[in-house]
C-alpha cells in the first residue's frame, strides 16, 4: 500500500464516522408555526394576566446547592425572600447534554434537546441554530407586541434575531478565563437600560457567565465562588428593589435560574446529578400573597442538607416546565413544541386555572399524535397532572428519529474499511497465517478487548481500568523476552514505578472519586508542586545539554517563557500565596508584572517563539545547515515544552515521570534480541505500546468519556476576549490530548533513527497501521453497540459522548497529530 492509497483510506474512515454521527444525532423534527388563541380569548387573557413584566436572569451553571445549601450558598437575600414567601424555589432538572445552547433551546421552546446540539454548541455560527421560525416564549412576547431587551451570553443572538431586541449587549460565552468583566458588561446596563427606562421595556433577559467560568477554572469550591454568589445576590437585590419602587405601576416577575449545574470538577455536559440539577427561583412581591409551595413551607433557608440529597432541594421540576408556566402567567399560548407542564404551585395565580390545565393537557395530547378532544370534566386536577406527566415522559423519551439509511451506509462503509485495514495489517506480518507475528495478533487482541467493552455502559465509563490492565500485562513482557540480569531488573522496576505513579496521579473514570491522589496532594502542598514543576523543566533543559549548543540555548529560552507564564497565570488567578517566595523574586528580577494583559502578551510571545523555532529547525535541517541526527530529539523536546505550556500546574510533574518511563522503554527496544522481532514487528510493537500509553495517560491526566471533563481552562492562553474559535479549538485539543500527543512521539526514535531515506514512507505507513486498525475495529464495535442499544437508558449519557470522543481521537490524534508532525519530520530528514 502506498501513501496515496493509505491517505484515501484514512479520509474515508473519517468520512464514515462523520456520516454515522450525523445519522445517529439527527436534528429533531419540530412542528412549524406559532401557537395562537382565539382573539377574544387572547384579549381576555392579556387583560387578566398575573404579571406585566418579566426579568429573566440566567446565572450560567447555577447548581441547586448554590442557591439553597447552607454549606456553600452565599445568596443571603435570596434566602430571606424564600423564607418570607416573596420567592419560590425549585430544583430544575436539565436534560443532558448539559451545555448552554441545547439548554437555552429547551428553556425557551419547551422542547427536549437533541444530542447534536452538543456539537452545535461549539459551532455556534451554524444557521441551523436559528430559532426565529420556531415557536418560543420570546416569539410569543414578540407576537403580543412586547419589547425585549437583552444583555449577556451571545449564544442568545445565535438563536434569536437581533431585531427582536430593542436593545442588545452580547458577551462572548467561551472566553472562560474571564469571570469579572464578562459579568460587569451585563451589570453596567442595569441603571441606564433597565432602571431609568423602566416603562420602555416589557421583558429583560440577563445572562451572567462569570460563575460558570469560575467553575471551569477552579471548580465549585473555588476561592472566588463565595464572592461571585454575593455579587449575583446583590444584583438580584438591586433589581428587586427597583421592582418594589414600581409596585404600583405594574406587576413584575423575576425568574432566576441556572441553565445547568456543574460536577465537582466545575465542568458540565454530562448527566451526573450535579450537572443536571440547576437552581430555579421565581421572585415577586405578589407571590407573598399566595400559599408557598408545600416543600418550601417545611424548611428555613438555607438548608443544611446531607450528601444523600444528591442536589435535590425543595421540589424538583423539569426545566422545560418553565416555558408553559411563563406562557400562562403572561396570558400567552403555550409554544408549539413545548412538552413542559405548568408548575402546579402557580395555578393559584391564574384567573382560570382549570382552563389553563386543560389547555396544557390538550397541547401535550396533540403532540403525542392523539387527535380529537378528550372529556376532562370527570377528572380532578391531580388526575390531569398524572396524565400530563405520563405523556411528558413518553414525549421526552421519543424525541429522536434516527436516519436509518444514512446509518446503514456509514456502518457498511466503515465495516469495509475495517476489513481492508485488518487485511493490510496481517499482510505485512507474513505471507500466510502460520507466519503471522505476535505483534499483529497483539494489535488485534487489544482492539477486540476494547471493542467488546463498548457493549457495556460501565466499561465505557470506566475504560481507564481496561487500559490499566493492558499496561500492566504489557509491562511483564521484558521479563520473558530478555535474559534477566541486575540492569534489566532495575530498569524494569523503574518502569513499573513510573506506571504506578501515573496511575496514582489523578482520579479517572466517572463512578469513583478518591481524595488521596497525587494531584490533590500537590494542590494541598503548593510548594511541593512548584518545586516538582521546576525540577521537570530543569530536567528537560539538562536533557538537551548533550545535543547542540544552539538547541540548549533555544530550549532554555522556551522553558523560561513557559515557566514564567505558568507562575504568572497562577498569580493573576488569585493563587499568589501558593507560589514560593523565590519564584516571586524571580519575576521581580526580570521586571515582569503579572497582569491579565501581560499574560496574553507573554503567551503570544511564547507561541510565536515556539513556531519560529520549530519551523526554523525543520527548514535548516532540510537545507542541511543543521545536523539531522538530532532532529527527532530536538522536535520531541520542543513539542514537550508546548504540551507542558498547555497543561494544568498539578499535572506538569507527570512529564518528568513520562521522560523517565520513555527512557526505560527506549532502552528495552534498543536492546531487544535481534531474533525476537522482524523490522515490521518492531514497528508494530512500538506503535502498539505508543497507542496503549496514549490512552492510559489520557485517562490518568483526568480525562474520561464524559463531555464534562473536557479541559477548557487551558484553551485560552494568549487569547483575548475577541477570540477566534478555531484557535481556541486547537489549544483545547492540545490541552486535552497532551499526554497522548507526548506518547505518540515514542516510535519516532525507534522507527526512523537508522533507516534509509527510501523506506521512510513505507515505515510511516506501517507505523500507522496498528492505531488505524485499532480504531477501525473499536469503531465498528462502538457503532454496532450504539445501534443495538439505541433505546438503552444510557444511550445519550454514556454511548453518545463516547461516540463524540471517538471522533475526537480519530480527527485530532489519528489525522492531525498522527500525520502532520511526522510527515514534516520525514520531509526534513530526506
Curated annotation (Swiss-Prot):
CDD domains membership: GPI_EPT_2
GO MF terms held by the record: CP2 mannose-ethanolamine phosphotransferase activity
InterPro entries referenced in this protein's UniProt entry, alphabetically: Alkaline_phosphatase_core_sf (IPR017850), Phosphodiest/P_Trfase (IPR002591), PIG-G_N (IPR037674), PIGG/GPI7 (IPR039527), PIGG/GPI7_C (IPR045687)
Compartments, as annotated in UniProt: Endoplasmic reticulum membrane
Glycosylation sites noted in the Swiss-Prot or TrEMBL record: 145, 185, 298, 506
Main localization, broad class: endoplasmic reticulum
GO terms classed as biological process: GPI anchor biosynthetic process
Chain ranges passing through the membrane: 322-342, 406-426, 440-460, 470-490, 534-554, 599-619, 652-672, 683-703, 725-745, 769-789, 806-826
Pathway, per record: Glycolipid biosynthesis; glycosylphosphatidylinositol-anchor biosynthesis
Changes after translation: N-glycosylated.
Entry GO CC: endoplasmic reticulum; endoplasmic reticulum membrane; plasma membrane
Cytoplasmic domain ranges by topology: 343-405, 461-469, 555-598, 673-682, 746-768, 827-830
Keyword Endoplasmic reticulum: yes
A Pfam family reported for this protein in Swiss-Prot or TrEMBL: PIGO_PIGG
Group of enzyme by EC: transferase
Family named by the database record: Belongs to the PIGG/PIGN/PIGO family. PIGG subfamily.
Function description: Ethanolamine phosphate transferase involved in glycosylphosphatidylinositol-anchor biosynthesis. Transfers ethanolamine phosphate to the GPI second mannose. Although not essential, addition of ethanolamine phosphate to the second mannose plays an important role in cell separation via the GPI-based modification of daughter-specific proteins.
Note: Present with 259 molecules/cell in log phase SD medium.
Protein name: GPI ethanolamine phosphate transferase 2
Highest classification ranks of the organism: Eukaryota, Fungi, Dikarya, Ascomycota, Saccharomycotina
Gene: LAS21
